[in-house]
Amino acid sequence: KFLKKVKKHPLNNKKLFSYICDASNEDEVSNFFKQINKKTKKIDSLINNVGIAGPTGTIEKLNSKDWEKTFKTNVISHFYFTKLAIPLIKKNKGGSIINFSSGAGIMGFPLRSPYAASKWAVVGVSKTLAMELGKFKIRVNVICPGTIKGDRMVRVIRDKSKFLKVSKKKIEKEFISMASMNCWIFEDDIGKMCSFLISDEAARISGQVIGVDGNAIRLD
């Protein structure tokens, strides 16, 4: 759906470029950057926002494939993209990298251990990158979205409802109540934070973990 919107956008082929690849496949990411290098010699920003919810269940009921798939998508993909983007951002004499974590990356998250572990890893890598890349004027920050209303949360609520054998409505209310503001987060909320962090207004902000979550106070 998103790519269709991009292709129909009046700026497509002028300022917008769309490309489909499996972010968890190193060869496909490499091919993506080959296409980027044909179009430009430098970039100013990278936003790593790919991620999956992972399985729902207690740890003794999960298997290694559950963990591997979650980490490959949520963490290793960030490595693939960041490694190839850094030289292009250096050529720009600085820029911004935004990595997406979650409230689960700063708190525990019952029944979602692979997801929580992967999101904590994103925070650790980002903090380290901020230290390594600061001398190149490259800022690295983390966004931790709250409960975003959309297709992904529909699947998460469905899976948790099935596992706990309770109604979807009950699970939905529980997710909303995790934030002190008792609200959903919307895609535009996240987009606005991204726009700020890649702008010159955030020129001195790096190494930060920023929640856009209505003040999430628990994950349970």
Predicted regions and their residues:
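Short, small/polar-rich loop/turn modules that mediate ligand/substrate recognition or access, typified
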Residues: G134, R139, I205-G207
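Active-site helix of classical SDR
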Residues: T82, S118, S126
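Short C-terminal tail/terminal secondary-structure segment
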Residues: A53-T56, M107, C194-S195, S206-D220
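Substrate-binding pocket helix/loop in short-chain dehydrogenase/reductase
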Residues: G57-I59, N63-F71, F175
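Short-chain dehydrogenase/reductase
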Residues: K1-T40, K65, R155-K162
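Residue(s) in the substrate-gating loop at a strand-loop-helix junction
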Residues: S102
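C-terminal helical subdomain
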Residues: V142, K165-I205, V212-G214
